[in-house]
């Protein structure tokens, strides 16, 4: 067996056409090809699946039943496999307890650091809380030079009111001759005037010593006596200098604030020993959001100002509100903004104990009457959310609630005792709020004692290494407290990549899925060098990628195609990037060599003269941003990772437009106002989420073509004779579907410690319908055969049915002619799902008042796919007069835009400002813009190519 290669023979997963391929080991290998060509089928569903399966098979049957079993891939032979680790975008943790710090293990090292070198500080008095042995106290005092005069005291009263006569009498009985009261020294026999109503501090003076050789025993005895008298506390007054407070306890001598023994678990917000008891370590509390409950205060109660109590299904709450308003004299026709503070308080928070007469008439005409206090809208929503057993009700109430920082821990997630432990005046929560760059600077400037430095050295080494890896993959703007669930797919993947680099494993096969997603061109070089360093320590990297820089940096490039779906699944070219670029059969090669390219538009649109203006956006890291978006244009928001693009577009603009135009309850990010919304009628967010969560959803159902197809089958003569309506041809309802498999076509057989087996239904043989339904044919085919057609075949088949043909044509236009009409939604990639959504929008009639938002639509798309996507987006603007706004890093998309908004200059706190706006040419001239710097050579190169192409065409 050749140990230098991974040999694959006869791979047939999904659309792979029985392919053979050899992949060099210990190299950076990039797999590319059109979206849907079979890259993931080869990389993840064949190579990774087999590597993982072989490892799991080595375990006992008992252990295997607890692990996610991989199906044996459809392949004849794979040799030369190493243990495989998959780093994709789908396995991001959505657990609210996961943060960047916990995922990268940096937080674990910080917990260890604080447990070993942290100093507890009383939050009330700001003094350090220490626990020391008498030997440590003696050693500390003897650090002072000889002839230093000291007095040892026992603090027996600390900040307490009273004359304390009894205490002084007891001191006298003990035989002590001097005391200090409020800083003044008295003889015990003096007449000491102590005011009863003032707070006082009293210390017994145990001994006065001059530091010299041989005083150790006397010093030890005196401190021991002080500790005994003052319940474990002693004060050593260094004459002419400061006082030292010693304690045998981890407790403040003034207020008794105590901290237990420092342990790593005390600094974990996922442990009951460290988590804030108010929020259970989540850092937030779910509270009812008044602005979501009453989004428009210019409306009256009768106009439905209170969204959750609108009389849609039940009349119970509207009737209760009317009765309460009658009792408390609140006018239901007055806009809420004109009601008095007291009236609004009753509506929102209730009438407390004051009861009112309530007569309720239900839908059946029955009347019930009672005297009850008015609960109030906010407590009502909170109670229903907390007490309900219905998921539907909980989801309904959750729409009106928002996460606010916990009032006890201020969002730091940890209990007060934990947050009192400091290193260099910072508690662990404050360090977690640092960005990666700030954390690196903090640890570089940390000042510790010699002993502490020795203890912390191995911890610093690990923390610095992990922070460095995160910086190298372009994530230096993230904070360690950032919740893992809020990260984009690309960010989450690069974090896992950084974690793997930190483990420094060798001999491993890493399989990555587009690690460059969401990464600005500026940070691409760092990512590529990170991948190369993983290769250099002895690992094989297989990267599914479309980014040109990554492809050119590969040791070996595999192009899978030539087309997508049925037209793909073959190895078109394999070799060095230069060899692939010169391969005439490779579309990827044509783009790498410049034979094919996406042209620069001849002119930029100015729009229709109207614009959308965002004023005072402050969500996340946005710094009071004002931005204008010209309507009827193709606009693009750019900027380095973390600069605030998603905050501006998704958090502020999309949510504000959805709230106004779609009556959505989502609360927009902080901003002053948005002008020009009246020029729009609908907002459409086209993301890469699946078009359906179950295999029952498919492209035909999503685009609405299946409705028309069912109508067509129901209108055939045979269907009319049998009395079949359109519902007969649905696989979701009883009647026409096969009841043995409930219209799924497959039956799941659970195998416990083996993977579940899916077998075709024995009754319908995978066709989903019963025999009677399949008897109905249109142009020789039944409904099951139609669902098995590709979209291209369907378009030809339904060419005389304009309603269906129009919908199928748009799917072909977005480059998805190869997918099957009945292909389960769960088998579509993110890029494919996004284009199905685009297709369903394309066939709708538009009046030019639609606003489309796309967040990184090029994810998973080859340069050829991007060309097709851009034609569709330009068509929405050109033909319909609609507005398209895209968040994007891909320079091919950016250069085609009419208008750019570039955010920056950096990520995180260093971003959130608009650096430049205008046409791509204007941005390219900007000295401050990183986007402009990388865009300029691309514009120049592609303008030359476009001119050459035009000149060549003219000669012909």
Curated annotation (Swiss-Prot):
Family statement: Belongs to the ABC transporter superfamily. UvrA family.
Residue ranges covered by zinc fingers (C4-type): 252-279, 738-764
NCBIfam families listed in its UniProt record: PRK00349.1 (NF001503), uvra (TIGR00630)
Keywords annotated in UniProt: ATP-binding, Cytoplasm, DNA damage, DNA excision, DNA repair, DNA-binding, Excision nuclease, Metal-binding, Nucleotide-binding, Repeat, SOS response, Zinc, Zinc-finger
One Pfam family, short name: UvrA_inter
Name of this protein: UvrABC system protein A
Keyword presence, DNA-binding: yes
Amino acids binding ATP: 33-40, 639-646
UniProt xrefs under InterPro entries: ABC_transporter-like_ATP-bd, ABC_transporter-like_CS, ATP_grasp_subdomain_1, P-loop_NTPase, UvrA, UvrA_DNA-bd, UvrA_inter
Superkingdom in the source lineage: Bacteria
Task of the protein: The UvrABC repair system catalyzes the recognition and processing of DNA lesions. UvrA is an ATPase and a DNA-binding protein. A damage recognition complex composed of 2 UvrA and 2 UvrB subunits scans DNA for abnormalities. When the presence of a lesion has been verified by UvrB, the UvrA molecules dissociate.
Chain ranges of the ABC transporter domain: 309-587, 607-936
Record-level Gene Ontology MF annotations: ATP binding; ATP hydrolysis activity; DNA binding; excinuclease ABC activity; zinc ion binding
GO CC field: cytoplasm; excinuclease repair complex
Keyword tRNA processing on entry: no
Gene responsible for this protein: uvrA
GO biological process, alphabetically ordered: nucleotide-excision repair; SOS response
Oligomeric and partner information: Forms a heterotetramer with UvrB during the search for lesions.
Subcellular location(s) per record: Cytoplasm
